């Protein structure tokens, strides 16, 4: 497995950082029944849809351009950040992130098409439009990198970290945390959930500490 930090930094790093990072390898979901945030969200919006989709399996989830783009952007950002924190900032800056996003979108599209019974769910023009928007997002993140993802006072502790907790006997909650950072100067942790959207955030959402803290 790739080293988390240089040997010279081992003494400075909270051992929990290593524990969190390796949890995605060590945790293996059991065969117990589990629920996810997606299923809870679906139930809150429409119990009938939840019944048809999760209980009766009568309405299978279908991939679309938004899930395709979201998956590709997640993977691109996570690869970029892992390179930045676990290798070098210079190496991350030299990555062709535009090409990486394109490759990830094609991979996500092919996977989604297979899940949809090999039916096309978008067009080449739409894929290209989303890719162009994604390039702007990546350029913005690189420009603001030091403000959002400082390598001086933050350590990347987790990517796609598995949450698998019993909430009732025999019922588990299963979820994945996009990014977990450790702040050695304060001993605090921060969790980042990557979201892609065409609508952006309203002012009240930006000020909601439960969404931005």
Stretches with model-predicted labels:
Residues 1-67:
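C-terminal, charged and often intrinsically disordered regions of DNA end-processing helicases
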Residues 2-13, 25, 96-99, 110, ...:
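Metal-dependent nuclease catalytic regions and adjoining charged, substrate-binding loops involved
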Residues 35, 68-72, 129, 174, ...:
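Generic recognition of stable, solvent-exposed alpha-helical segments in well-folded globular domains
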Residues 40-86, 131, 135-139, 160-161:
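Nuclease catalytic cores
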Residues 47-60, 116-117, 191, 197-201:
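Short amphipathic alpha-helical segments and their helix-coil junctions
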Residues 61-65, 69, 122, 126, ...:
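Conserved aromatic-histidine-acidic binding/catalytic patches
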Residues 76-159:
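A non-catalytic, helix-rich entry segment at domain boundaries
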Residues 154-213:
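Mg2+/Mn2+-dependent nuclease catalytic core
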């Amino acid at each position: 497995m790739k080293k988390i930090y240089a040997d010279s930094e081992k003494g400075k790093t909270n051992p929990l950082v290593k524990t969190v990072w390796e949890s995605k390898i060590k945790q293996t979901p059991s065969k117990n029944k589990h629920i996810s945030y997606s299923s809870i969200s679906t139930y809150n919006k429409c119990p009938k849809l939840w019944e048809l989709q999760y209980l009766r399996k009568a309405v299978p989830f279908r991939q679309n351009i938004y899930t395709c783009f979201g998956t590709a952007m997640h993977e691109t950002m996570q690869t970029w950040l892992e390179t930045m924190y676990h290798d070098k900032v210079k190496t991350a800056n030299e990555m062709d992130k535009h090409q990486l996003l394109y490759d990830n979108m094609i991979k996500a599209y092919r996977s989604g098409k297979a899940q949809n019974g090999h039916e096309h769910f978008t067009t080449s023009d739409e894929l290209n439009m989303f890719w162009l928007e994604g390039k702007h997002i990546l350029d913005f993140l690189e420009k603001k990198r030091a403000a959002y993802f400082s390598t001086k006072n933050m350590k990347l502790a987790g990517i796609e970290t598995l949450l698998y907790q019993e909430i009732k006997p025999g019922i588990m909650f299963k979820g994945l945390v996009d990014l977990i950072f450790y702040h050695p100067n304060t001993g605090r942790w921060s969790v980042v959930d990557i979201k892609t959207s065409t609508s952006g955030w309203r002012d009240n959402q930006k000020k909601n500490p439960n969404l931005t803290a």
